[in-house]
A protein has these predicted regions:
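Cleavable N-terminal export/targeting peptides
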Residues: 1-45, 272-273
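Short glycine/proline- and aromatic-enriched beta-strand/turn motifs that initiate or cap beta-hairpins
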Residues: 27-91
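Short loop/turn motifs that connect adjacent beta-strands in outer-membrane beta-barrel proteins
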Residues: 33-45, 111-116, 148-156, 169-171, ...
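Transmembrane beta-strands of outer-membrane beta-barrel proteins
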Residues: 46-50, 72, 81-85, 104, ...
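Transmembrane beta-strands of outer-membrane beta-barrel pores
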Residues: 52-58, 78-80, 87-91, 110-112, ...
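Outer-membrane beta-barrel translocator domains and adjoining extracellular loop/strand segments
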Residues: 58-65, 93-100, 129-136, 168-174, ...
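Outer-membrane beta-barrel "beta-signal"
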Residues: 231, 258-273
Length: 273
C-alpha cells in the first residue's frame, strides 16, 4: 500500500480478501490482505502460520522492493468471532524508511443459508517507521460475503468492500472493492490443488493526495490468478500479479520502476497445529 503514502510525501500495508470458504481462499492466497480464519463451531481454536514469499505484493504493488519476505501469523477463532496478528518485513526504499509491518485484525463471520459474511476491522502498523511527514499506520473496515456455487461443485466466490477514513500516507478516504474466486481441482498425487484469483479496484481522491500517476488519476485496478498446492499442513502457491498502472514512477503509488507491473510470485507456508 505504500505507493499511496508516497503521493502524500511527493505501497502497503498488508488483506484481507473476503474470507472464502474454499480451502485455498481460506489460506489467504489471491487477495489483498491477510485472510480471516474459517470458524469451526463454538470452540476456541488457535493456529500459527509461518511462511515466506519471493515478493510481498499487496493489491498489486510490491511491498518489499521486489525482494523476498518472511511472514507469520497467529489466529484465534471462537464460534463466529475471529482475531489475529500478522507480520512481515517490508522495504519502501526509504520512501519512507520502514522495516516491518504488523497487522492486527478482528471480526465476525455469521452465516445465512449458504452465504458466509465477513465483517471486520484491520489495523496496519509500521513500528519504528520514519514517517513523520505522512503517517503510515491506518485503520480499515471491511464487509464482504462468500458462498459455494450451487451449480459448479468446488467453486467458491465472493466480494469484499474495504474502507478507510484516512488511508496510509495521510491521503484521505479510500475504498477498495475486491472480488475473488477459488476452484478446487481433483486430487493430484499427494497434493490438493486449487485455482484462485482476485480482481479489485482502489478508489481515492486526488484532492486529498491519493494519486496513481502524479496527476488527477485517483483509482487503479489490480488482479491475480494462481495455483495453490496443499499437502498436509503445507501450502505452495504460484501466482501471477498485474495492475493497470504500468511503469508510472514519481510522486504517485510507485516509487520505482517495476513495483506496480506484472510479476510472478512464489509463496510457501505451514500452518500449525
Amino acid at each position: 500500500m505504500w505507493g499511496f503514502r508516497n503521493s502524500a510525501l511527493t505501497l502497503l500495508a498488508g488483506v484481507s480478501l473476503v474470507s472464502l470458504s474454499g480451502a485455498a481462499l481460506a489460506d489467504g492466497y489471491g487477495g489483498s490482505v491477510k485472510d480471516a480464519p474459517i470458524a469451526e463451531g463454538r470452540k476456541l481454536d488457535l493456529s500459527v502460520t509461518l511462511g515466506g514469499t519471493s515478493d510481498y505484493v499487496f493489491r498489486g504493488i510490491s511491498q518489499t522492493f521486489e525482494n523476498p519476505a518472511a511472514q507469520g501469523s497467529v489466529d484465534l477463532t471462537y464460534g463466529i468471532f475471529y482475531a489475529g496478528i500478522w507480520a512481515s518485513n517490508v522495504d519502501f526504499d526509504d520512501n519512507p524508511k520502514a522495516n516491518a509491518e504488523i497487522d492486527l485484525y478482528a471480526g465476525l463471520k455469521p452465516t445465512w443459508g449458504p452465504v458466509t459474511f465477513d465483517l471486520g476491522v484491520l489495523y496496519y502498523a509500521y513500528p519504528s517507521a520514519k514517517d513523520s511527514a505522512a503517517e503510515l499506520d491506518y485503520v480499515e473496515l471491511k464487509a464482504g460475503y462468500s458462498m459455494a456455487s450451487p451449480w459448479i461443485k468446488g467453486l467458491t466466490s465472493g466480494t469484499t468492500l474495504y474502507w478507510s477514513s484516512e488511508y496510509g500516507g495521510d491521503v484521505g478516504e479510500v475504498f477498495t472493492l475486491e472480488s475473488a474466486a477459488a476452484y478446487e481441482l481433483p486430487q493430484f498425487g499427494i497434493f490438493s490443488p486449487s485455482i484462485t484469483g482476485a480482481y479489485g479496484t482502489v478508489y481515492g481522491d486526488w484532492k486529498e493526495g491519493f494519486s496513481v500517476d502524479g496527476t488527477r488519476e485517483d483509482e487503479y485496478t489490480y488482479w491475480n490468478v494462481g495455483l495453490a498446492l496443499a499437502v498436509e499442513k503445507f501450502t505452495f502457491d504460484f501466482r501471477y500479479w498485474d495492475t493497470d498502472i504500468g511503469n508510472v514512477v514519481g510522486p504517485a503509488v510507485c516509487v520505482s520502476e517495476g513495483l506496480c507491473d506484472e510479476r510472478f510470485v512464489f509463496t510457501a507456508k505451514v500452518t500449525l497445529p
